[in-house]
């Protein structure tokens, strides 16, 4: 047998460094015989240096032990605790053949396979223990760990049983929270994490920071921003450079700005929390689309449109599939008097939207062209193109949906190229606004009032003035805003004309 020669090529196969589950002894085992310990130390020593010597030392030790189950278990445990996984595995096979119903042997065999990350066989060993002793808490704990990534429902059952047997074992709630988090059952995860968080001491030794990350992200999914802030305030001092904790604290503070009594203070708190983004405290690859989107939202709230644009550009560079980002960026470009970029970005949004684009999207595109046309620094040649494009799309929308009130109002505004004189085309469009908005007067009352103002101006400006229509329009306007100066002035004018 040249097993040592084969495995010596890879230290990872000889010595385990798997600390995914902090292993402590979960079974009864006699102290190792000092003579056997010295011989075992030789096996471990030679394993990486001299495979032939290691094999001889191993054979000598095993012969010396003979058939004693207790000594095989104590030496195997010594190998396991020295992270000499090959020796531990070989002893586990011998022990399982000798005593397949011994709970201590089964627990040992399960521990060895856990070290090897052989989760399936580890689970079988712990299942065997539970078939003999259903209330074996240590086997239940190991089973929960083994199965939580491969068969979470088995793990959940084990953890619930542990809670029944040992209500003080708060780690069961942590594990239940982790499992439900991975199953995207965030509401359930929050409940378990709350139980864990209330019970665990808040220090770096006892508190599991990764589970706190999951706890905060579960709270975020439930929009529980108040609780997020409470938790992050306690946990961040324990892990001040944890990116997930910083992220969740920042997101919560941005979401709380709108309802803060001290708005300026809330904005400052959010700005301070965004330092991990502003100061590039982490490698760029670690930032998410949402990091930059939230930073953009914050800068937009502060009125810093160029900075908001920059962050949205970074966000979309991270994830170009986020369609809402293109839509928002397009609007920001327009606000920043970069109408051409706004149009280009919105067209990208429409291309990515594909068949899901609807008339409202086409309408918004027309408003982008209209904004570009109205932008003062747009070259005249481009103005003409933008004017034509906007008009074409507004008319296209109206043709497909004749009761699209907003399309009429915007086309009327676009067509009002000379505000000093009445234009019949504009009057007709505003008449359509009143007509198509009739079924929803309250919803469109601002548009209706705007239409009344123009139509009244038209009626009294033409020769001869259309006083009868002007009276009707004045009454409509009065029904919307009876105390408005326009209504009062219109009534005064009509009275004078009647004299």
Task: Give residue spans per PLM region.
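Canonical tetratricopeptide repeat
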Residues: 74-78, 108-111, 142-145, 175, ...
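Residue-level recognition of tetratricopeptide repeat
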Residues: 43-44, 77, 111, 145, ...
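TPR alpha-solenoid repeat register
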Residues: 71, 105, 139, 172, ...
